[in-house]
Regions:
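Conserved C-terminal guanine-recognition region of P-loop GTPase G domains, centered on the G4
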Residues: 20, 26-36, 41, 68-73, ...
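C-terminal-of-GTPase-core extension/linker across diverse P-loop GTPases
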Residues: 1-13, 32, 135-209, 215, ...
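Short alpha-helix plus adjacent loop in nuclease-associated cores
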Residues: 106-128
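Switch I (effector-binding) loop of TRAFAC-class P-loop GTPase G-domains
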Residues: 184-186, 191-199, 217-249, 257-267, ...
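Conserved nucleotide-binding/hydrolysis micro-motifs of P-loop NTPases
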Residues: 17-21, 50-52, 84-87, 106-109, ...
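Flexible beta-alpha connector loops of hexameric P-loop NTPases
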Residues: 18-23, 53-57, 115-119, 159-160, ...
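N-terminal accessory targeting/assembly segments
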Residues: 1-110
Length: 398
């Protein structure tokens, strides 16, 4: 995996507060954390209050002067805008500021590029990167060449920064075909699980909510779990053996985030749809985060976009061991539990709840198999749950 921080970038964050916009200060706090994840140091921030973003330059002319002065004073190498810039906005800001210009989408794509491990993840990232760049070739070519590296130049598709629109279209077409094969493979796996009557639960949540830690603690696996944004990019599925002998498959998914780029939603559709096809949703919330309520809203909006609502949802208010942990109201959830994936607090209650949910869906059957049909009992073990068996003179009673 490529390491962040080989080339330190000093950046100024720029945001626009509009009437219909969320709190931009909080959004810039998250942007700062994203920038840090990508190896950049935030040296300042500027916010403009406007009815709407400037269609040509994102911010007004007066604010551009302020940004230029701050970039110079702090010896910054570039700026990161809190929203996705249009091609015109990118080109105009690049020309006005004479420094590297990036936006939230480019930043998140860059982090994803360094986090991708599997071939599927790399294909999805490259596809998202190329779709984003195809409309911004001129501005990005100039901006990203300023430092010869850094944010925006990482990833499987960045061995050579493509600046030819025709080549990009050809590459996108090839990636779509590769991704189509991956999606077919995923469908086969899902069909196999369905035939085996194996229930699945998708673990979803805002990035860094503790999803991978939960999966590791429950199943004893060793999925990459770090206290950083997007530590997990590729979905991981593990078998959970419940205390009563029942089993369920748990899938750890990529974390959601505020203003998740449309390019990523499209490219990662096959991965994100693990939530759509799961039998249950386990929604992990970082209960110690002051923005927990906003993060819950983002998760549900993303699930709605994916068509993954309408099934039983278990909300886990995680990190109860952390200072400031709380429990919020979740009207979209069927069940809520207080847990700590780190210490194990509350996980016994989760086990009991999963046992209850699985038991409610089971059909109990009693049958006597003649000894010549004993082989069928093995099929019961494979595709169901054998509660008891008794050998009698007539055959095997199950």
């Amino acid at each position: 995996m490529e390491e962040f921080g080989k080339l330190e970038e000093r950046v100024v964050l720029v945001g626009v507060q509009t009437d219909d916009h969320d709190n931009v200060e909080e959004s810039l706090d998250e942007l700062k954390e994203l920038a840090s994840t990508a190896g950049a140091v935030t040296v300042g921030r500027i916010i403009q209050n406007r009815e709407s973003v400037h269609p040509g330059t994102y911010i007004g002319k007066g604010k551009i002067e302020e940004v230029r002065a701050l970039v110079y004073a702090m010896d910054a190498t570039g700026i990161i805008c809190d929203d996705e810039l249009s091609p015109a906005q990118l080109n105009n800001l690049e020309r006005e500021l004479d420094c590297k210009v990036m936006d939230r989408t480019l930043l998140i794509l860059d982090i994803f590029a360094a986090r991708a491990i599997t071939s599927e993840g790399k294909i999805q990232v490259e596809l998202a990167q190329l779709r984003y760049r195809s409309a911004r070739l001129v501005g990005l070519r100039e901006s990203l060449s300023r430092l010869g590296g850094g944010i925006g130049t990482r990833g499987p598709g960045e061995k050579k920064l493509e600046t030819d629109r025709r080549l990009i279209r050809t590459r996108i077409s090839a990636l779509k075909q590769e991704l189509s094969q991956v999606e077919k493979h995923r469908e086969l796996i899902r069909s196999s699980r369905a035939r085996g009557n194996m229930k699945t639960a998708a673990i979803v949540g805002y990035t860094n909510a503790g999803k991978s830690t939960l999966l590791n603690t429950l199943t004893g696996s060793e999925v990459l779990s770090e206290d950083k944004l997007f530590a997990t990019l590729d979905p991981t599925t593990r078998l959970l053996n419940l205390k009563d002998g029942q089993q369920i498959l748990l899938t750890d998914t990529v974390g959601f985030i505020h203003k998740l780029p449309h390019h990523l939603v499209e490219a990662f559709k096959s991965t994100l749809e693990e939530a759509k096809y799961a039998d249950y949703i386990i929604h992990v919330v970082d209960s110690s985060n002051p923005q927990a309520e906003m993060q819950m809203h983002v998760v549900y909006e993303t699930l709605k976009e994916l068509g993954a609502m309408g099934k039983k949802i278990i909300t886990l208010f995680n990190k109860q061991d952390a200072p400031g942990a709380c429990v919020l109201r979740d009207f979209k959830s069927d069940y809520t539990l207080k847990v700590s994936a780190k210490t194990g607090e509350g996980l016994a209650d989760l086990n009991d709840l999963l046992e209850k949910l699985l038991a409610e869906e089971q059909i109990y059957v009693e049958r006597l198999f003649p000894y010549q049909e004993a082989g069928k009992i093995q099929l019961i073990r494979e595709y169901g749950q054998l509660i008891s068996e008794e050998y009698t003179e007539e055959g095997i009673a199950v």
